[in-house]
Regions:
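NTP/phosphate- and nucleic-acid-binding module
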Residues: 1-92, 97-653
Length: 653
């Protein structure tokens, strides 16, 4: 048996060997640090026995996959601790996630004091150092085992598996869980962990099911790594848009209105309007024409497009197909509406490409458990557009869509924060998609070649395509490390036929166009959340709800402050006067806390000379300036959408 290691070196054995034995054969230090093995790309237990040639990578907590195994084991220690302290608690599921792990329990909510007690119990379990053992049962025996333990959620999971399934279990001491693994060799490997919070979550993510209590935690190989992560989490909490966006009066939510339906407050509306005007202007420069289409349509439209068969569960349906003559649905996308704009008149090959843009309000029936601030909502606004093109124009137009997205990211100052993904179909799950395999393979290859030609690093994600075509997803992480899609550009070689769309070619024949579905900047609400967290609320000046705060040093200079305000407003600057009888230092600190980029202090000298004393978040005290001089520089900064560097230390905090 020849084992090929990650560095290309080979180990030869005359008999079967476990992964941990091979790790010890390489070095004792590696074996002690090992969390799991990766055999031919599959993550397996260290206890897994190898008996044939393969490629092997020993995973430690320094590897993402190895750290995930450590965290998965931590979730089992958590579940054991909870059931030790609260025997009535029923266990559901407990996976590792990007930032740690969680476990769901059928139990009343846990307080911070409860979490502290659970942590202590986890430390006791870890100190005992029980070995982790894997064993299997038949499906029938596994169901009987968990029925006897009165664990209904485990029973339900097993009952969903095929009858001939071999069910995998992991035990640590006297506690056992249903699990596919892999896991560490012993609970002793969980050396640095922290329980972070407790929240509610529906069983299997559906609001039709029982509400469970979820405990979140994180774990690392060392206490220093954990300490660093917790410090980052504290900073993340300060930037969390769900907290900061409310404090800055950008948005709020109200229970009686519903989850996923945020109220955008006046400050948020200002920002969205600025973004919308900019995006629409940029699209107009690039030859887009605007449409305005209905918020709903009959089910007939979605049956033609395929959304009724492939996306109905994600739509808000109005009416009952069995009893109502007509059933409507709120639109989850704009594409079929813009197709009928195209079909309203005949087009020749000379008319193409046609680029339709619309600032659309869309509706998607997300699960309640998925709702979060502005990033996951049920009604949202998006810079949507569809390009109807000849096949020979497809590559150029698709590249131009990528270029527009990159330009928008650059202007917003977030181009270095994103990752690119080629989202492909899953040929093993064909019922999710329309079209033939060869069409999918061809269109995916076109996108792959384009990304390579543009020197854009990307990953390929199987099963993430839309049901009608592959796409480029441009993703970004929030402050907690969760990745969201910000911008999407899709290649569609199928829906033109569904809608009988055509153009007349140079020979007078009807030909099918191709379609590009794209966004310039994506969902406005999600972009707002992204910008709040990126800038910790200290937005570039052009986006700030309030750009200038005028601060008279005493009430007797309020009239002059009012004149300065009028002059700025005449030039389109968003500003206000703080004419209260508070101390000037207090008013300056308050303006800073409210993240106003410029403060203009006015007193006797400023009034006498017709000037203002400028204090900015960027440089601090910028000295006394003519109003015209300040205004000219400010207008230029806003026009160019400049992102000024913050150089004053107190503003960075």
């Amino acid at each position: 048996m020849i084992i090929t290691l990650k560095d290309g070196s080979k180990k030869e054995y005359s008999e079967a060997k476990s992964v941990i034995d091979i790790a010890y054969d390489i070095s004792e230090g590696l074996a002690r640090a090992a969390c799991a093995g990766e055999v031919n790309g599959e993550v397996v237990d260290l206890r897994t026995v190898l008996d044939k040639d393969c490629e092997l990578n020993i995973l430690t907590a320094k590897d993402e996959k190895g750290l995930a195994v450590l965290r998965h084991t931590a979730s089992h220690v958590l579940a054991q601790a909870v059931q030790n302290l609260y025997p009535e608690a029923k266990v559901a599921i407990g996976p590792s996630i990007d930032t740690g792990f969680y476990y769901d329990f059928d139990h009343e909510p846990f307080s911070r004091e409860d979490l502290d007690a659970i942590e202590k119990e986890m430390k006791k379990i870890i100190k005992k150092g029980a070995k982790i053992e894997r064993f299997t049962k038949s499906r029938e025996d596994a169901i009987a085992y968990f029925k006897e333990k009165n664990e209904p959620y485990k029973v339900e999971l097993i009952e969903d598996l095929p009858e001939d399934s071999e069910i995998s279990f992991y035990s640590q001491g006297d506690w056992t869980d249903l699990c596919a693994g892999p896991h560490l060799m012993s609970v002793k490997g969980v050396k640095a962990f922290k329980l972070l919070s407790s929240s509610s979550a529906y069983w299997r993510g559906s609001e039709k099911n029982a509400m469970l209590t979820r405990i979140y935690g994180t774990a690392y190989a060392t206490k220093d790594e954990l300490k660093e992560h917790l410090a980052q989490m504290e900073e993340a909490k300060k930037r969390d848009h769900n907290k900061l966006g409310r404090e800055m009066k950008i948005f709020t939510t109200v229970d009686v209105i519903g989850q996923g339906l945020p109220l955008i407050m006046p400050n948020g509306v200002i920002m969205m309007q600025e973004l919308q005007r900019w995006i629409e202007d940029e699209e107009t420069k690039r030859g887009y024409v605007r449409t305005k289409t209905p918020l709903m349509a009959k089910s007939d439209l979605y049956k033609i497009s395929g959304h009724w068969d492939h996306y109905k569960d994600g739509m808000f349906v109005l009416g009952d197909e069995e009893t109502d003559k007509e059933v409507f649905a709120l639109r989850p996308m704009t594409c079929p509406f813009q197709y009928y704009v195209y079909k309203a008149e005949q087009h020749s090959y000379r008319d193409l490409p046609l680029r339709y843009g619309e600032t659309s309000t869309l509706f998607r029936n997300e699960d309640s458990g998925e709702m979060h601030g502005l990033t996951r909502v049920r009604q949202f606004t998006i810079s949507e557009g569809h390009l109807i093109v000849r096949p020979d124009q497809m590559v150029k137009e698709f590249k131009d869509c990528i270029a527009l997205a990159q330009y928008c990211l650059q202007v917003l100052g977030v181009e270095e924060d994103v990752t690119y993904h080629l989202s492909k179909w899953d040929p093993n799950n064909r019922e999710k998609y329309i079209g033939e395999p060869e069409v999918w393979e061809e269109t995916e290859e076109h996108i792959r070649q384009m990304l390579e030609e543009l020197n854009i690093p990307f990953t390929e994600d199987v099963g993430e395509a839309a049901f009608y075509g592959p796409k480029v997803d441009i993703n970004a992480k929030n402050v907690y490390g969760k990745e969201d899609t910000m911008i999407t550009i899709q290649w569609d070689a199928l829906l033109a036929e569904q809608f009988d769309m055509y153009y007349i070619d140079e020979n007078g024949d009807k030909k099918r166009p191709c379609i590009i579905h794209r966004t310039s900047m994506g969902c406005y609400e999600r972009t707002l959340a992204w910008l709040i967290e990126k800038y910790a609320g200290m937005f570039p000046t052009w986006l700030c709800p309030e750009q200038v705060r005028i601060i008279p040093i005493s009430e007797k200079f309020n009239d002059y402050a009012g004149k300065v305000e009028a002059q700025l407003k005449e030039e389109g600057i968003r500003c206000s006067v703080d004419g209260r009888s508070e101390k000037m230092g207090y008013k300056i600190r308050e303006a800073r806390l409210e993240r106003v980029p410029y403060m203009l202090v006015v007193g006797a000298k400023e009034e006498e000379e017709g000037k203002v004393s400028v204090r900015s978040r960027y440089l601090g005290d910028e000295g006394m300036k003519d109003i015209g001089e300040f205004l000219g520089a400010l207008k230029e900064e806003i026009k160019n959408k400049t992102i000024r560097k913050i150089e004053v230390q107190e503003e960075k905090k």
